[in-house]
A protein has these predicted regions:
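Glycoside hydrolase catalytic-domain groove-lining segments
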Residues: 40-41, 51, 144-177, 183-260, ...
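Short, contiguous strand/loop micro-motifs
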Residues: 32-34, 213-215, 267-268
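Aromatic-rich peripheral "rim/lid" segments of glycoside hydrolase catalytic domains that contact
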Residues: 12-26, 111-114, 123, 127-146, ...
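His-enriched metal-coordination microenvironments in redox/metal-binding proteins
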Residues: 59-61, 212-213, 306
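Generic structural microfeature
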Residues: 45, 95, 117-118, 203, ...
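Substrate-binding cleft and catalytic face of glycoside hydrolase catalytic domains
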Residues: 1-176, 180-182, 247-253
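Short, electropositive alpha-helical surface patch
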Residues: 70-90, 183-199, 316-326
Length: 344
């Protein structure tokens, strides 16, 4: 459900009247005469497949600087034109977030009988804290650098929460802010999610998604555990959203041009990886068990491994997953994961 999957790489426009007939939500502040045509074909198929196989989905992601096409920011939805003003972009966000969520939740009702049966969480905004990358310039061309108080991030959560209210799903579906290196940027992240919730009638962002592309050397298990404690102590639900465990990875960043994603042979073994996985999982389970349930009733509610096996991983050379060449090739890390999961 990434933005480019719905919006496409090339813009196809339809009138507001056509859009409304298709069930699109056109907000009152939307002053343009047409909207981009949204493609829900892939989403609809994924929803049906998930339901047929008793699988839950997270909506990843509504706003993300990396994969929102450039034309979405230009005058007349043209990438070659100047960026629109803030009011126009606000209306586009309102239209996009509301329409996508409304479609998905309505489709859920058709397939499963009610919302929240398939999509249990939404990553409403992804990686705002790392907006300094070149591909985030489209957002800053409209809003400038709002630093710790981005109005458009807060706005996206407001629209998303309104959709949960519309479908009576505020207790069924959690809205997340999702980012990487969260274990090193705890205070910045808490400041951002607290800003999102500031002055709202409810905690519209009640979840923190911890992308966790960890290495067996970085972060330490103690650093990761300390971040978990702080997020839960602040009253947030936590999900570990993109977990893998690299070995022989260039953690000092000296080889950033390596197309194999910073592989660096340091003689680390899959047995060392397995030991780390066991310690890591035992730590996560202990943090969940020992949390203050009056402050964080839910605590850690999800853990997503970022891929099936090493040979198709985005960091395959660093062997980050629980299986090797195929799903029929379990590594020692898989057994370690299972052993830790049995911890009482």
């Amino acid at each position: 459900m990434k933005p480019d999957a719905v919006l496409g790489s090339k813009v196809t426009m339809i009138t507001k009247e056509e859009a409304q007939k298709l069930g699109y939500i056109i907000p009152d502040n939307y002053k343009e005469t047409s909207v981009p045509k949204l493609n829900f074909d892939r989403i609809d198929k994924i929803l049906q497949t998930a339901y047929d196989n008793c699988l839950g989905l997270r909506g990843h992601t509504l706003l993300w600087h990396s994969q929102t096409p450039a034309w979405f920011f230009g005058i007349d939805y043209d990438a070659d034109e100047d960026a629109v003003d803030e009011d126009t972009m606000d209306a586009r966000i309102d239209f996009y977030v509301s329409t996508v969520m409304d479609h998905v939740m309505q489709k859920e009702k058709e397939i499963a009988g009610e919302t929240g049966k398939i999509v249990y969480a939404w990553d409403v905004v992804n990686e705002y804290l790392h907006r300094g990358r070149a591909w985030s310039l489209n957002w800053t061309s409209v809003y400038g650098d709002m630093k710790g108080t981005p109005s458009y991030v807060k706005r996206a959560f407001e629209r998303a929460y309104e959709m949960l209210e519309k479908y009576d799903a505020t207790d069924k579906v959690t809205l997340f802010y999702n980012d990487y290196d969260t274990y090193f940027e705890v205070e910045d992240l808490l400041a951002l999610v607290n800003f999102i919730n500031e002055g709202e009638k409810a905690k519209i962002c009640s979840g923190i998604g911890m992308q966790s592309h960890v290495d067996i050397k970085r972060p330490t298990i103690e650093e990761y555990g300390a971040a978990l404690e702080k997020f839960m102590a602040a009253g947030y639900e936590v999900q570990i959203t993109e977990l893998d465990f690299t070995i022989n990875f260039d953690t000092d960043g000296t080889d950033k041009k390596d197309p194999s994603y910073d592989y660096k042979n340091e003689g680390e073994t899959i047995e060392e990886q397995a030991a780390f996985v066991k310690d890591f999982m035992e730590m996560v389970i202990a943090k969940q068990k020992n949390r203050d349930k009056t402050v964080s009733p839910k605590g850690i509610t999800g853990l997503t491994i970022w891929g099936l096996y090493d040979s198709i991983s985005w960091r395959g050379k660093s062997q980050p997953l629980l299986f090797g060449t195929s799903i029929d090739d379990p590594k020692p890390a898989f057994q370690a994961f299972l052993e830790a999961s049995r911890t009482k």
